Amino acid sequence: MSINVTENHSKTFLIITLIFLLSLSVTGFGKSPEDKGYEIAARSDRSDNGYGDSKVEMTMILRNAAGDETTRSISFTTLERENEEVGDKSLVLFNTPQDIKGTALLSHAQILKPDNQWLYLPALKRVKRISSSNKSGPFVGSEFAFEDFTATELKKFSYKFLREEPCGELTCDVLERIPLYEKSGYSKQVSWIDQSIFQLRKLEFYDRRGQLLKVLEASDYREYLDGIWRSHRFAMKNVQTKKQTDLVWEDYQFKTGLTDNAFEKGKLSRIR
């Protein structure tokens, strides 16, 4: 009986090729959308590691549906926690206008537990703890919610890669992320992360009914500390009310020596 060696080799090659292609469906280029989404989000999150602490002055510009503007000046400080299982700390302090001068929001970000947030109201001379059920509400009349002013910790969300597409002159990875922490005001968020410096360019917020609520656009990125990038303008548009809030940052200062002592609840009433 004759044996067709060439035919057998062809069949063997075909089988090996099929096995290789099947392996790609679960590893390498064939990563699941969830694994790929988490990998991209982690790369973006970790690209900013190592800044230590930061101080920056910023301007908040509120626009109503008619286009009328109100401006507020704010000091914003943050303290980085190197352990990904421990959230960062931040402090927002209003300097103007006079009627809200001294108002301060202290945030201790958590991972899956509700963030710890306290609001100091100088007119009442008291510190108010923000309950987890109120964190989806607007922060001092802006289009940013209380939960938007805490650190976006990597493990607060589950992720799914959706697609790759142009975003301006760049190319972005588009990810869906779903809050894993309790009582979020959002059912999901969709983020655009650029492939050049791995920074957020756009973020869509969907309300609890699954309807698009707000769109955040981040621009004017500048580099600090050899690889630490910061946006100098956020534009948050509420597509349901047509209102908008912009945040405009001045130059950042990093590694200024801040410690946990600067982010204690008991010191809120003495902050100036």
Region roles according to the model:
Residues S75-E82, K160-P166, S219-R222:
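Short amphipathic beta-strand and strand-loop transition segments with alternating hydrophobic
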Residues A42, L106-H108, N116-Y120, R126-I130, ...:
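Gly/Pro-enriched, hydrophobic low-complexity segments
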Residues G28-G30:
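Boundary at the C-terminal end of the N-terminal hydrophobic targeting segment
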